[in-house]
Amino acid sequence: MAVPPVAPAPVVLAPMVLALSPHLDDAAFSCGGTLAQLAQAGWRVTVATAFTRSVPDPQGFALACQSDKGLPPDADYMALRRAEDAAAMAVLGAEPRWLDFPEAPHRGYGDARALFGEVRADDTVDAPLAVRFAALLTELRPTLLLAPQGVGGHVDHLLLIRALDRVAGGASILWWRDFPYAARTNAPQPLGARFQALPEWTLDVAALTERRLHGCAAYASQLGFQFGGRARLEERLAEAGPVERFRLSGTPPPGGRTGPGRTGG
């Protein structure tokens, strides 16, 4: 008597989180503990960074953005930063994805004031970025998205939010507070009213303090400029505390705490 074949067990994929980071460090600096905790809990974690293109022969302000970090003009600054990101993601348990869009200094923003000013009328990078995000959503089918609130007002952060707004639909999104800008007194919050109206979601990542620190410290080229060195990074993370704070659109993931919207982001 023939034995009927045994049907294979259905493949059940772990839940998936996709973090959309403007730059190569934003996700780790702002929510590295959350990324690590989700990875430790069995989630598949991907961090897709928007503005990572290497631009040969940088000029003007774009060149200054690498020379002020001690790099020579012929250095491939973004290749260095992508390598740092790969190291950081390995620490946090995430897969890095690098989208091929140029940073703001290569799109006509000529000084630091412009980076934190109004988005240029001719800067429409959010349209092709939205197309790329839509492709990622189709490919990865994330359970949850993470993205910045735009605290600090950097144009690249604001344009990423515009791009995500085009394609997010009813997705569940945790919007992070952009660190280190959020830790600075009177940091601009151009979208503050929007996010303060959403419920707050918090996650205690105290158990992953060291992993969060080591992930952030992997961005060695940025530590002097952003924090004054690794020791000061550690101090700033300690000052920020072990709780990472978000605003929530949609259904919250397990493990955190949800509260009402409030002033302060």
Name these PLM-found stretches.
Residues 2-167, 213, 262:
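Active-site beta-strand->loop->alpha-helix modules in alpha/beta enzyme cores, enriched
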